[in-house]
């Protein structure tokens, strides 16, 4: 499969999981997939086959055009008390690697040449024991004042739950204040924190 070219063979030739053949036939005919089809696409180990189908649809819809978002990712702090076992990022308060970025630090980053053309600022970080809603309101307002066109995409769901709690706010009140200050979306990681059944 060429990087930007149409597939040269029928989709079935790119599949290693025979269960995907009926889905590939639907894709080739331009038919809508069912929930069950989606579940199988999620469960199959045949990632190249799924990728071939996705490439087929993308090429049919958009030809050789590819779209992307110029995003800058920053972490406003690496200080975190959570100690997740998968995280090599965190630092404890007092650790020489520990940092908290001020709004001014973030503005300096956005003024650097590597941020030229950025349309989205993506920020996620740890659970800093002393940050509260006021820090985020100040940060969002200053970024939006200096870069009104940049989309602010901030917080995993776990961060929202944590910072709402330590700020003495409901999740809804915390988000209302963040949105009023400039927050526009969240990446969505950790949403299971809000559902007891999923967390269990």
Regions found by a protein language model. Name each.
Residues 49-93, 98-124, 186:
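N-terminal pre-triad scaffold of radical SAM enzymes
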Residues 27, 31, 58-62, 88, ...:
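Structural signal for hydrophobic packing residues in well-ordered secondary-structure cores
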Residues 1-73, 77, 81:
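Flexible, acidic/Gly-rich N-terminal and inter-domain linker regions that tether
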Residues 21, 39, 103-111, 115, ...:
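Amphipathic, non-transmembrane alpha-helical secondary structure
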Residues 118-200:
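Conserved SAM/AdoMet-binding glycine-rich loop
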């Amino acid at each position: 499969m060429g990087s930007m070219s149409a597939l040269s063979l029928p989709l079935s030739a790119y599949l290693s999981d025979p269960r995907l053949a009926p889905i590939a036939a639907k894709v080739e005919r331009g038919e809508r997939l069912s929930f069950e089809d989606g579940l199988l696409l999620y469960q199959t180990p045949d990632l190249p086959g799924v990728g071939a189908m996705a490439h087929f649809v993308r090429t049919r819809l958009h030809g050789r055009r590819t779209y992307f978002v110029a995003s800058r990712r920053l972490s406003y702090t690496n200080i975190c008390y959570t100690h997740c076992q998968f995280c090599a990022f965190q630092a404890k308060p007092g650790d020489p690697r520990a940092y908290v970025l001020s709004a001014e630090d973030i503005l300096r980053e956005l003024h650097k040449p590597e941020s030229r053309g950025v349309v989205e600022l993506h920020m996620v970080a740890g659970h800093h024991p002393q940050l509260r809603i006021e820090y985020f309101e100040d940060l969002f307002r200053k970024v939006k004042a200096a870069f009104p066109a940049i989309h602010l995409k901030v917080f995993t769901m776990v961060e929202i739950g944590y910072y709402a709690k330590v700020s003495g706010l409901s999740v809804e009140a915390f988000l209302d204040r963040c949105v009023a200050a400039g927050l526009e979306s969240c990446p969505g990681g950790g949403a299971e924190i809000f559902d007891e059944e999923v967390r269990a």
